[in-house]
Amino acid sequence: AKNLLAYRHNQLPKAIENARKLGFKDGAALFPQVTNNGEECHSEWEITFEEIHRNNIIVYAIVQHAVLTGNMDYIAQYGLEVMIAVSRFWSQRVSFSQPKQKYVILGVTGPDEYENNVDNNWYTNYSCIQCLKMTLRFLEMIAQQYPDEYARIRRITNLDQVKESARWRDIIEHMYLPEDKERGIFIQN
């Protein structure tokens, strides 16, 4: 598992480049769906540019590895840098819907790959929230327990923690999650 996560960290510069090609900035990362060198190799547009929930599972895997092994050094040395880049992607990918007064994520393909180009896939929106929460939680933990690594991460990522954390918290608090209130269930999109 650690080798797979190291692979993702090693591919971070290409993931940032992939996101930059799509108009994202400031170190936002979009990891490829299919690759052998970090560049996107998948030819289906709907999967390549809409199945973006894949970013969140990378963050989830980083956190699960650290929690299950007790190896917080990994997050301090490698994982948090990836988590920040993915959170920056989401910060730029969401849109604020005035009618809903919520953040929305438009034009995605969910993990079942059944419906393409849908708005507000529940899994994608929910996992975005969880990604941002995990990044915030581990930023605070690393700042307290690994101050030297925290300073290094802030320097290499050019992190404006006050500004970026405020934005991420706002998204967490105001993300739209589709639901059928009458039946008390979340709907796919």
Feature map (PLM): residue ranges:
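Acidic, mature catalytic/reactive cores of soluble proteins
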Residues: 1-189
